[in-house]
């Protein structure tokens, strides 16, 4: 394949996928996790003109956004993963004090993906040995974030939005993992991408939403009024900045921040990144949700392997697609 043919523009026609060579990416840089929010220019303009939008920008500038807390067990586990002297016994000893985490890790170790020889393990040490320390960290991170997104708060509309975010974030993350798996199958060269990390970057992409919802709650408590339908577009517009703050303070690397912020890319790198996977996922889910208005505004660049993946997924039955996503969610307990 020549360099000129190395990238393709993906378009969708009904249920079929087609591609043409040598086109460019033309992104208006939406937040990738908000694929479910209908495009509405009127609401978007009112959102960025609102007092709440400017209040959020100011809170972010002075580092006053309320951040979700990260559990101590996960912080300790991250430190253990960074220590080259850490053993499986160290991780098992940390987890054994938390019966819920222990049960989830043993269940993951016995899932079809990680138990290919069909040997059931019943103790945490065997489970940690089978999965490996890094995968343990990834599974626990995924479960922690998913639990966090199912937190109940007093404001009914905000609570419903968090539930909605949890559902769609899981859909976005598991689809990222699935696309990553299939890229490894179709690519004719080794990829420096891991489905597990693709899943986590997807789950964490809208983590800043918690801080934004808190700002909205404070805004309403102070006697202000703002239509919640307008507030959703403020959340969409501000989520990249808020998520970047959270991920930076939690110590996540640039791959996570790139997926959360969807930065404008001017140089075309032939290497597929997690951001590429996220953009493919975003475009595919717009197709799945029949969000034609948003799809018309966005194009995504793919190499030939990416084109094959998108062709397979867009022609896959709903039953088979959901089955493959369910295998991923079951493995991670989300």
Protein language model regions, located:
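Divalent-cation-assisted or electrostatically stabilized phosphate/pyrophosphate-binding catalytic cores
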Residues: 123-126, 160, 220-245, 269-275, ...
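Amphipathic alpha-helical interaction segments
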Residues: 43-44, 243, 329
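A non-catalytic, amphipathic alpha-helix used as a structural packing/dimerization or gating element
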Residues: 171, 242, 320-323
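Surface-exposed, interaction-prone regions with an acidic/low-complexity signature
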Residues: 172, 199, 215, 220-233, ...
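Conserved alpha-helical "signature site"
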Residues: 1-204, 211-218, 247-252, 256-302
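Acidic, carboxylate-rich catalytic segments that either coordinate divalent cations
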Residues: 289-334
């Amino acid at each position: 394949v020549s360099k000129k043919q190395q990238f393709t523009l993906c378009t969708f026609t009904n249920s079929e996928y087609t591609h043409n060579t040598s086109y460019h990416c033309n992104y208006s840089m939406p937040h990738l996790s908000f694929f479910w929010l209908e495009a509405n220019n009127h609401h978007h303009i009112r959102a960025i003109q609102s007092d709440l939008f400017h209040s959020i920008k100011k809170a972010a500038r002075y580092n006053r956004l309320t951040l979700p807390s990260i559990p101590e067990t996960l912080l300790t586990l991250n430190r253990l993963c960074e220590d080259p002297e850490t053993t499986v016994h160290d991780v098992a000893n940390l987890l054994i004090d938390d019966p819920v985490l222990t049960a989830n890790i043993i269940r993951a170790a016995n899932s079809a993906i990680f138990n290919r020889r069909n040997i059931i393990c019943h103790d945490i040490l065997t489970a940690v040995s089978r999965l490996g320390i890094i995968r343990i960290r990834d599974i626990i991170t995924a479960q922690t974030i998913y639990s966090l997104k199912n937190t109940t708060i007093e404001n009914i509309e905000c609570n419903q939005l968090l539930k909605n975010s949890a559902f769609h974030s899981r859909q976005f993350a598991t689809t990222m993992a699935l696309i990553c798996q299939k890229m490894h199958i179709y690519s004719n060269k080794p990829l420096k991408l891991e489905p597990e990390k693709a899943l986590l970057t997807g789950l964490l992409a809208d983590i800043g939403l918690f801080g934004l919802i808190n700002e909205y709650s404070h805004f309403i408590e102070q006697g202000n009024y703002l239509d919640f339908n307008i507030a959703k577009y403020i959340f969409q517009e501000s989520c990249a900045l808020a998520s970047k703050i959270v991920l930076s303070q939690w110590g996540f690397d640039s791959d996570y921040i790139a997926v959360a912020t969807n930065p404008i890319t001017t140089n075309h790198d032939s290497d597929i990144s997690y951001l590429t996977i996220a953009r493919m996922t975003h475009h595919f889910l717009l197709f799945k949700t029949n969000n034609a208005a948003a799809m018309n505004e966005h194009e995504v660049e793919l190499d030939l392997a990416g084109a094959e993946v998108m062709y397979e997924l867009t022609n896959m039955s709903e039953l088979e697609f959901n089955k493959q996503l369910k295998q991923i969610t079951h493995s991670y307990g989300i």
